Each structure stands twice: as C-alpha cells, then as structure tokens.
A protein has these predicted regions:
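Beta-rich, blade/repeat-based domains predominating
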Residues: 37-47, 74, 97-135, 169, ...
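Blade-level signature of beta-propeller repeat domains, shared across WD40, Kelch, NHL, RCC1
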Residues: 348-390
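Loop/turn-rich, solvent-exposed surfaces of beta-rich toroidal or solenoidal domains
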Residues: 285-339
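Beta-propeller blade signature
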Residues: 74-84, 155-161, 215-228, 320-333
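Beta-strand-rich domains and repeat architectures in extracellular enzymes and scaffolds
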Residues: 32-76, 347-350
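A short helix->beta-strand "capping" segment at the edge of beta-propeller domains
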Residues: 16-39, 112-116, 167, 336-339
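Short, conserved, GDST-rich strand-edge loop motifs in beta-rich repeat architectures
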Residues: 54-75, 145-146, 194-218, 302-323
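Short loop/turn segments immediately following beta-strands, especially the blade-tip
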Residues: 157-165, 269-274, 372-378
C-alpha cells in the first residue's frame, strides 16, 4: 500500500514546471545562445575545435513506449554547429541528398565495436543520449553515442573532416537486457566506460514508479560498466549508485568520475592495482548530469534543481524550454573541491568550455546558452581528450 500510495502521489505531482518562452533570434544575433534546437542534451568539441557536436535527444510522451510503438517518438539526431557563425550540419541520421554520408553504409572490412552488433541503427528510431569524442591509437577521430532507439547500444562513428564534419557508422556494442544507459566516455587504455542509470523507464507503470521512488530516496539503481574488445562488458567494482548519469575518465585512465544524479554527488573511482577501486565523493546542491573536461584539467558539471518530480514535469512542455533551476560547477579532480560557477533556469544537462565561454545544453529546451566563463576563462591550455589504445 505504501508503494501504491507513492505511485499515485508521484503521478499526481509530476505537473508542468515553469515554461520559458521560445528562444529569441535576437539572443543568437547577440551571441547569447544558439536557438532553434531540440533538446541539446549533450555537447562535445569536434577535432579542430571549430565545431561542436550536439546530441538532440528525443522526448517520449509520458505514456509512450518507443520499443512497442516507434511512432510514439520523433527520432533524435546528431547535429554539428560551427562556433564562429552558428552554421549547422546534420550528421546523423544522414541527409539522403548528401554524398558524404551514404546510407546504408557500404560494406567495410573493418568494423569497430562488438562482433555481435547486428548492423547499423535504424535512422527512423534513432534516440541519442550521452556522447563522447576521442581518437584511437592511429589518430582516427571517433564518436561514441548512447542510443535507446530500436536497441540499447553504444553506437560508434568515425569522424570525417572534409569541408565540414561528417560521420561514418563503424559499429556498435549492444547493451544487456534490463539496463538503460545514460552516458559514455572513451578510455585511454582501450574501449569505453558507460553508465547504467537504471532499469528501463517505460511509461508510468509500476516499474517506472518504483524506480522513481528508489531514485528519489537515493537507493542504488545502476552502476558503471567498462567495455573492451577482449573482455566485453564488465561491471566496475564499487561503482553502484543512485541513477549514475554523466561519466568522465582521467587522461591517464587511473580515475573515473561519475555524476550520481539520485544522490546529488560526484564520486571518484581510483584504480591502484588489481583490487576494487577506491571511492570518494563530493556533495552538490543540484542533481548532476553530464561531465566535461576544461582546458586546465578540471571537470565541469551541470545539474538540475527541484528533484525528480520537477524533472518529470519537464516532459509535459511542448515548446520553449523547461524553466527548472540549474547550477554549473567546476570540480578539482585532485581535491574533489567543487566551486559553483553560476546558476540559471532552463533544465541544464551539460556545460562545455569553449574558449572564454561555457556552452550550456538542456534535456528539454530549444537552445544552447552561451555564458561568459567566470573570471574570463574557466581554464588555460592543458588537458586534451585522451587517445585510446584500441
């Protein structure tokens, strides 16, 4: 009865929070935002740092199930934005008229990822989430994408750079049944790490409501897994947590940082020898989402305020942006000291340093905010994305 009462309360309380009006083109002209976007949930710099790649995450109706009814969700996409002038190029699903991105991809002798990958994703069902840019030991740039559409998998693309960025699908790593992944990060020693946020959230059934209860009360719902070509997917010891969300790997691979959304904390796993990693954490005032590195080797994290009920309510918003509060933090990876850089409204899910700006994306919104980095610059030249050994 207690669970049933909670389920009824959760369903009733997940109302719509404040709605921000649609992004004004004048904001884009003034260099304050990139407008006319669709849920820019995660961002990453592309090689050369002239463009960013944006994961535009589709939103499901609260009662829809994309697996059972693909038509219930409009597919998401991967978009490139040129920072200098805001020019845009859709990277995936490919444009049928674009000769640089033929689809289906031509047969290739070299496939990346798991040999059990059944083939390319269905563009009509593509639902991207967390992303990460890296390079392999041969210097080939690549993009990892968590995809929920048609299958739960990490899709792997090779990044091309002709006159503008392009993507070539190279393979995938299917995820186990009963898991809903959130974010992915390349590992410098090979493969990647990926967060298992929770069991799949489908509609407003009792399973979803129970998972929501577990997250709201800080109970464990998921963990972090590492994939390598040799060992496959393995859960990392000491990594279980409440709604593991964003993830980042230290450039030397000795530490992994995880945004524990349900616990409002960032935890660090330190690897020293063959035993379980050591774990410590720093508490935040917001529920942390995606992580990114600054040039001076600190972590940026955007987090939402208001808790799970407010976040669920964001799904009812049809235009503009969800107006829940957010905070952006810089975290020292050595001391785990967290410094709050700025606050705002707009359901922020990622903060990315670009020159003297911090770009802020949203999981329910139509814009990327362009904020001046506090103190003129968040970082100084230094850390760069790590190469991977595979």
């Amino acid at each position: 009865l207690g669970v049933l009462a909670f389920a009824l309360e959760l369903t009733a309380c997940a109302g719509s929070p404040e709605t921000l009006p649609p992004c004004d083109p004048a904001q884009e002209e003034a260099g304050l935002a990139f407008c006319d976007l669709r849920n820019p949930e995660d961002l990453a710099l592309l090689p050369g740092h002239a463009w960013i790649v944006v994961s535009q995450m589709a939103r499901l109706d609260a009662d829809a199930n994309a697996e059972a009814d693909p038509a219930s969700a409009r597919p998401g996409d991967l978009l490139a934005i040129r920072l200098a002038d805001g020019a845009r190029r859709r990277l995936f699903p490919p444009n049928a008229a674009d000769p640089d991105t033929p689809w289906p991809p031509p047969p290739s002798e070299e496939r990346w990822g798991d040999g059990a990958c059944p083939g390319p994703p269905d563009p009509a069902r593509f639902l991207p989430h967390g992303i990460d840019v890296g390079s392999d030991h041969r210097g080939r740039a690549r993009l990892a994408v968590v995809n929920h559409g048609g299958r739960e998998a990490v899709e792997i693309f090779e990044i091309g750079a002709r006159t503008a960025p392009s993507l070539e699908w190279r393979g995938c790593v299917p995820m186990p049944e009963g898991m809903m992944m959130n974010d992915v990060a390349w590992h410098p020693a090979g493969g990647f790490v990926v967060t298992n946020f929770s069991p799949p959230l489908e509609g407003r059934g009792l399973g979803t409501l129970w998972t929501g209860f577990e997250i709201m009360t800080g109970r464990e719902t998921g963990s972090v897994l590492r994939w390598t070509p040799d060992a496959g997917l393995v859960e990392i010891g000491n990594s279980r947590g409440s709604a593991p969300n964003g993830v980042a790997v230290a450039p030397d691979g000795s530490e992994i940082f995880v945004a524990e959304w349900g616990a409002k904390s960032i935890f660090r796993l330190r690897f020293d020898g063959d035993g379980e990693p050591l774990r410590d954490a720093v508490a935040l005032e917001h529920s942390p989402d995606n992580l990114s590195w600054t040039r001076d080797g600190r972590l940026l994290v955007a987090g939402q305020g208001g808790g799970m009920l407010k976040v669920l309510g964001c799904n009812e918003i049809e235009e503009g942006a969800c107006g829940i509060d957010y905070g952006v933090y810089a975290i020292d990876p050595v001391s785990l000291e967290a410094r709050r850089l700025f606050d705002g409204k707009g359901a922020a899910s990622v903060a990315l340093e670009v020159d003297d700006e911090v770009l802020v994306g949203s999981f329910v919104g139509d814009r990327i905010e362009r904020r001046t980095a506090p103190g003129r610059s968040v970082g100084s030249p230094g850390a760069q994305p790590a190469e991977s050994a595979d």
